[in-house]
């Protein structure tokens, strides 16, 4: 049994996430976690809310609440929506946890011991109107790289270029909108990433199986222009993890906090500590996932994220782990995604554009969204959500192919043999051909899932569903029943066993529908098939079943048009 550690990029606390966020990290991570559990492996799937930094402070101010209260409330909201989307986290933590405070300060202390942190006097934007320094996202302006007029002081969400606030053209305060800004001197700590450049370069070179998207972004930041730059890891903010050198105060850093992008990845580790505490387990139980000197040497660690998060996860976070000089588990595979666009433009949390997770669940159950998003995952290039494509995919794949198969075979069996698996007859050449095809397709499906090729996995699963429909069309048990009811019984028996097989194979994509199929077949046998022929005899003659309600309802043109109109603007 393999041990698989999975982390999804942790979502900002500042509101409910849109479908683009979901498909870029949490959803494919859940797909992989469910698949690995289904194969009998030991999985630790961790995620959390990212609660520090400017987004949290600004969102709390807008909501008229203290930031700690706002974060606690929104963590509950995000956890509930994640549960309703079927995201099977082993723990959904908080970057504001006591565990993350302690670990972040610990790493800073170790980096300082190893001469990998330097103190820098720098000039920073100060807002006279707001009476404070304006780091990062407190400043908006025009991106000097692409001209986007709503770029933030840390990164342009349009072109993904990392920025410093002083890089922005026509900067303004994100708090008050004031342009009465000036530059003043302040002191901050910098992580000396440049000192680790060669180690990071060699480490990335060793990851031959990483997606091109991941390695190309990492290499760009390592080698383009002046190469890998040192990164500021402190900020002048009220909310965050206080700057300390381990458990000791850090002279000159009073009143400052660690930069959100320093503490957020450390929360992956801290989250495991939160999990252990929540389940009454010892530290050894979480350390066996994260410390290679305490049992994590046999763990395979996989990360999922959007491409804008890649520089931090391939450079800054690894620099923190390597620079600590301690035996922490490093990522083995980093699966990154391009952007999902929305109807000709971008999804945007800050702009309220697109469909958000809570709104999606008001319209349709989670499995509809899970299937479309995963089958259209933006792996090799950006992809686009359109309502026409969503309707066509749901109606064809889920309703016509899978749902229709389940409905036809269960209803036919009930009408001719009753609600139990019929006996009699034997599998012949048609059935053997289907078994051979499904055997080949199952191995291909497993290969794509192991390689985290999300779209190809969805295509292969759909082909497995379609093979059942094609078999039914060809075998036509409803016709054969008139002349050879015994052999028709064998065909129906195979069809009912296919439903159980489909439930097991489909569970990573559409877990709720999978559970309904198993329930209809009145079985809890969800063992992954080793051999297709054996799997298609799992439900023996005489085994009772029920005809399920419609698995997936078709989306009407009227509904599609209504949703298209409803989500044409921005979220208020």
UniProtKB/Swiss-Prot annotation:
Its cofactor is Zn(2+). Disulfide bonds: none annotated. The keyword Amino-acid biosynthesis does not apply. Pfam families: Anticodon_3, tRNA-synt_1g. It is found in: Cytoplasm. This is Methionine--tRNA ligase. It comes from Ruegeria pomeroyi (strain ATCC 700808 / DSM 15171 / DSS-3). The keyword Translocase does not apply. It comes from the Bacteria. One of its GO terms (biological process) is methionyl-tRNA aminoacylation.
